[in-house]
Amino acid sequence: MAPVASRRVRRRVRSSKRPDARGRSAEDWWWDRLAPRGSGYHLLQADSMLLVLPDLEPPRARAHRRARRRAPRSLARGPTAVAKPRTKPRPEPSLDQGLDSGWGDRIPLEVLVHIFGLLVAAHGPMPFLGRAARVCRHWHEATSHPSLWHTVTLSPSLVGRAGKGNLKGEKKLLACLEWLVPNRFSQLQSLTLIHWKSQVHSVLELVSKFCPRLTFLKLSDCHTVTAETLVMLARACCQLHSLDLHHSMVESTAVVSFLEEAGSRMRKLWLTYSSQTTAILGALLDNCCPQLQVLQVSTGMNCNNTPLQLPVEALQKGCPQLQVLRLLNLIWLPKPCGRGVPQGPGFPSLEELCLAGSTCNFVSNEVLGRLLHRSPKLRMLDLRGCARVTPSGLCHLPCQELEQLYLGLYGISDGLTLAKDGSPLLTRKWYHTLRELDFSGQGFSEKDLEQALAVFSGTPGGLHPALCSLNLRGTRVTPSTVSSVISGCPGLLYLNLESCRCLPRGLKRVYRGLEEVQWCLEQLLTSPPSAKEPT
């Protein structure tokens, strides 16, 4: 079979005739047009195709070879002439020889580890450390430093079809981890597993044996996570205090067993809402995690329309140290409290409350008061989609140094009666600390917005306000109000004026950066009065 195959593909052999010879055929002319001499390409003819392929040899070496072949030979004069030995041409220095090949060895190991640490912090340890370890022994020693492997993300590559290919990729990566974990992960602190379907137990078993300093574990889109696996990890890693189960199929019994084992040291917990979330919240209400600081419950890819009934006062007693509470895109309602029941202990350490959602929710002034009546340290309040909350209810909150306030309504205010006044109550209370403000979709009148935003242009004492982000999308803000806000807030870096019906055409867009915001101010100040009429 080999001789037959060799006859099918052949390389075109050029004729020894000169290009300008009279006997040159049309075929030779086309071959020279497709692959001219010295172009670095040659032709390969098959049964039904013609391939133009690059030469494998470098052009410089080929030029030297042709120069030697074309050099005229010296004729011997007489019978005693002796042929002179052919001298090889002196090779030209290459680029690699011109550079100093030992510069990497002269860098101290501590400096090299620090440089690699900067790269790892920006892009992660893999695949950079694996490639750098092949450069030289000095670099291999630097990449093996355990401090460079404190944060690792492991995701098997998909080979072939999604089902069988993922299992093949998991087994291949697991074989590498059997050497990598005991030799590199001794100081591992943060581990993230993504898209693991069947080998989660094997990976976490290796981690429990060789990673005693693990503090954070994230399982994203992982399956077959059992209670035995999580309990084994909780017992082996005594410093583990953060667990992220966002978008993972984990049984509630496994999470409850883990919290019973490691709940006393838990600081952060991320959950995806499902029908089993109530059992996990029940463990939190029983004071299973008294030191919990961050709690996030959000919907997954498949939205669950079953409302979550949250006992607010019981959560305040079970998690008194809570600093961040996020209930994202949930349909939830607080458990009603009976008449004459005193208020709960509140969240005295709460700094961030996020109740944003894209659907109608049951958050009102009364619910907000039950959550924040004892939260003076609140810095961020996200109420996007909470159309039932009014400015009069917000101004009674005990927090005095709010920095981020989001009240945007994105497409859910249709058919609802929105407040047309009250925005000055918010800006007058928090103008000295507000850095980000979102009024998008609110129904405040032109005069009400003018009074509210005028606070940022006339701050007492000559101090500039801290406002750097302002979202007025879909509001009735006027050009004069916008220009006064920009003039009074020199640090404004984000301004959203989309769908503002009172602004002229050409200015209803998003402005990012100081230059774009100042350009908007120039257009408002220099445009004629006729152009400032609403369109």
Curated annotation (Swiss-Prot):
Q: Region annotation Disordered: residue ranges?
A: 1-25, 61-99
Q: Which GO terms describe its cellular component?
A: SCF ubiquitin ligase complex
> Keywords assigned by UniProt?
Leucine-rich repeat, Repeat, Ubl conjugation pathway
Q: Where are the LRR repeats?
A: 169-195, 196-221, 222-247, 273-299, 304-329, 330-357, 360-385, 386-411, 415-441, 474-499
Asked if the keyword Repeat belongs to this entry, the reply reads yes
Task: Give the source's domain of life in one word.
Answer: Eukaryota
- The answer to whether UniProt assigns keyword Metal-binding to this entry is no
F-box domain: from which residue to which, for each copy? 54-106
User: Entry's CDD domains?
Assistant: F-box_FBXL6 (cd22119)
Gene3D superfamilies this protein is in?
1.20.1280.50, Ribonuclease Inhibitor
Q: Which InterPro entries match?
A: F-box-like_dom_sf, F-box_dom, FBXL6_F-box, Leu-rich_rpt_Cys-con_subtyp, LRR_dom_sf
* Composition bias type Basic residues, residue spans: 7-16, 61-72
Do you know which Pfam families this protein is assigned to?
F-box-like
Q: What does this gene product do?
A: Substrate-recognition component of the SCF (SKP1-CUL1-F-box protein)-type E3 ubiquitin ligase complex.
Q: How does it assemble?
A: Directly interacts with SKP1 and CUL1.
Put simply, this protein is called: F-box/LRR-repeat protein 6
The organism's taxonomic lineage, starting at the top: Eukaryota, Metazoa, Chordata, Craniata, Vertebrata
